[in-house]
């Protein structure tokens, strides 16, 4: 079964086509990395998939439900961990978790919070105010908050942007543990991140997904020794 399916998904702003007849299928439990240079259409695509922007034309199915006719139900099945960490800076880590659990009216909230604290290893910072946390800890908390309502689909937007190498690798380990449990759509500018984490990668150019495949298959297609080189060749057309 597919978590996400699009059929000729298109978005135009006046005379400019930002997303152009996009056809995409993402499997249940898959970690799918959506890559592309700035202006390729990634952000608009994500906004349409999450119901924040209405398509000019085309269809979106989320968990086999038509998004246009089931938007409220679908919004309870997905969540977003945005590029800018979605945390309350003046609340402690525990208070953030309790607050978001209340917003989502989570049943058995104490049990849910305890599990997230354990999974994200937040014990040592549980009573720290969020604004005093390092970037890495803030990212952990932000992703934990995005999971508190038990979504079936999680959108991770630049989850390790601005983090040092150690904090980035630690967050990778956490994301890897989520693989197979929920569907994850990852957007990132770090090629090594997409290569390390993704089951499959889609590369966008001019509003279209021009290739999909594993990092290894795309490297082979582009005749490149690294995935970063493969990405450059694909988006510039050098491998064609």
Which sequence ranges carry the predicted segments?
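Conserved ABC transporter NBD signature motif
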Residues: 58-69, 73-74
């Amino acid at each position: 079964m597919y978590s996400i399916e699009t059929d000729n998904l298109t978005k135009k702003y006046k005379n400019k086509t930002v997303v152009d007849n996009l056809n995409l299928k993402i499997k249940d439990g898959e970690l799918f990395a959506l890559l592309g240079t700035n202006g390729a259409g990634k952000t608009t695509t994500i906004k349409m998939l999450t119901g924040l922007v209405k398509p000019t034309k085309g269809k979106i199915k989320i968990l086999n439900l038509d998004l246009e006719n089931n938007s409220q139900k679908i919004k309870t099945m997905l969540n977003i961990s945005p590029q800018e960490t979605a945390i309350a800076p003046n609340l402690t880590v525990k208070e953030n978790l309790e607050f978001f659990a209340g917003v989502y009216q989570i049943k058995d909230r104490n049990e849910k919070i305890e599990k997230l604290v354990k999974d994200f290893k937040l014990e040592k910072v549980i009573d720290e105010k969020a604004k005093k946390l390092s970037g890495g800890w803030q990212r952990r908390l932000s992703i934990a908050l995005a999971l508190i309502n038990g979504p079936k689909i999680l959108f991770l937007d630049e989850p390790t942007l601005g983090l040092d190498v150690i904090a980035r690798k630690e967050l990778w380990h956490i994301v890897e543990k989520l693989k197979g449990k929920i569907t994850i759509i990852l957007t990132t500018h770090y090629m090594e991140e997409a290569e390390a984490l993704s089951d499959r990668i889609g590369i966008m150019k001019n509003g279209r997904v021009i290739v999909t495949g594993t990092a290894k298959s795309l490297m082979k297609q582009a005749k490149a020794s690294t995935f970063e080189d493969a990405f450059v060749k694909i988006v510039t057309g050098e491998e064609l």
